[in-house]
């Protein structure tokens, strides 16, 4: 009798879910999606969500929160004060291990955006970095591990041949460069490279770390990914899917509507001036990669980091559950049955 009842319930819920296919996620979940990003390229792909919400074309309501450093986002994500976040790829892997699968990756959002810059004219190759001090942001995340990996690949010991000074935010690095003035060397991401060059015309890009990565590695250099709390994804698979639809449109707008996106970047606080974003956006490698392509790119990138330093990805490589895919019909039905009994 119980099996028959459950079967009837599942059938009923499936029918309801099929009828609701055309409904918006706003109908399915009244809560606002809380998503965080860093002041940089990973958030530049998110800002058009706000424009979409304002003009009524977004499937969801968004609370986009901006932070200067990844370590400000992590505790909020763990505590459930955020639903999603755009964070460095290796940090996502580390959090997955630390939270026992508490987060999942939804998409790759940014490829390589890192550059070595200097205010002098002394660096023309990695060999010229020997004995020098390098200013950088991102300790424990993409900038640190990419820089160390490339230094080693170019015959330099990052612990002996150079001195790396880390700062919490890229804006602190640019401020320190300005204070040092002569022959300062730094690793900076876009749009901070552009912002710094607009203030100081003597600043020059000496190494494009994406190009340098491609010389020694056959995997994609991935700067950022978008993650979701696993519990949230399990409770709201329909909302996650609706977000991804909106997000894909937002990324497309970031790459096609440069003026509009630049204005939003200033409005949100990603950059100080829209002019900076307008000049930097074409160099920010903002992407939307999902599914098998996402999994292939991330897993290959994490393998490179793991081989160089297991600590970079949390001690071990994440399993397949690290990657969120579109929920099956059964999962959607189970979700709706769960809601019926709450």
PLM regions and their residue ranges:
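Short, low-complexity disordered leader/linker segments with a strong preference
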Residues: 1-32, 331-342
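Short, glycine-/small- and polar/acidic-enriched structural segments
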Residues: 26-161, 165-166, 190, 206
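A bilobed periplasmic-binding-protein/Venus flytrap-type ligand-binding module shared by bacterial periplasmic
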Residues: 48-50, 114-125, 220-239, 287-290
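Secondary-structure end/capping motifs
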Residues: 233-312
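Periplasmic-binding protein-like
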Residues: 108-118, 204-232, 282-283, 320-321, ...
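Pocket-lining segment of extracytoplasmic ligand-binding domains
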Residues: 90-91, 172-264
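Conserved C-terminal helix/tail region of periplasmic/extracytoplasmic solute-binding proteins
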Residues: 299, 303-342
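Short, solvent-exposed loop/beta-turn-alpha elements that line the ligand-binding surface or hinge
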Residues: 53-60, 211-219, 286-295
């Amino acid at each position: 009798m119980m099996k028959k009842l459950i079967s009837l319930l599942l059938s009923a819920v499936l029918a309801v879910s099929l009828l609701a296919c055309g409904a918006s996620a706003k109908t399915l979940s009244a809560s606002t999606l809380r998503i965080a990003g860093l002041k940089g390229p990973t958030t530049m792909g998110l800002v058009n969500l706000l424009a979409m919400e304002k003009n009524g074309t977004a499937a969801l309501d968004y609370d986009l929160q901006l932070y200067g450093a990844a370590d400000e986002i992590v505790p909020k994500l763990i505590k459930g004060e955020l639903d999603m976040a755009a964070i460095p790829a290796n940090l996502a892997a580390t959090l997955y291990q630390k939270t026992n699968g508490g987060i999942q990756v939804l998409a790759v959002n940014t490829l390589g955006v890192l550059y070595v810059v200097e205010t002098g004219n002394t660096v023309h190759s990695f060999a010229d970095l020997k004995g020098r001090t390098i200013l950088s942001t991102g300790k424990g995340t993409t900038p640190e591990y990419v820089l160390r990996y490339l230094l080693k690949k170019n015959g330099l010991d990052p612990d002996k041949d150079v001195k790396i000074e880390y700062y919490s935010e890229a804006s602190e690095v640019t401020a320190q460069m300005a204070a040092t003035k002569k022959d300062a060397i730094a690793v900076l991401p876009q749009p901070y490279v552009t912002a710094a060059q607009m203030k100081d015309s003597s600043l020059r890009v000496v190494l494009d770390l994406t190009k340098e990565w491609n010389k020694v590695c056959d995997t994609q250099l991935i700067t950022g990914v978008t993650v979701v709390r696993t519990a949230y994804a399990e409770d709201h698979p329909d909302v996650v899917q609706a977000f991804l639809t909106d997000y894909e449109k937002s990324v497309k707008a970031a790459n096609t509507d440069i003026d509009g996106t630049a204005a939003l970047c200033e409005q949100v606080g990603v950059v100080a001036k829209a002019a900076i974003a307008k000049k930097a956006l074409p160099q920010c490698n903002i992407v939307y990669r999902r599914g098998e392509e996402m999994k292939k790119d991330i897993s290959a990138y994490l393998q490179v980091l793991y081989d160089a330093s297991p600590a970079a990805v949390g001690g071990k490589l994440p399993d397949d559950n690290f990657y969120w895919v579109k929920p099956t019909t059964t999962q959607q039905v189970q979700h709706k049955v769960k809601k019926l009994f709450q």
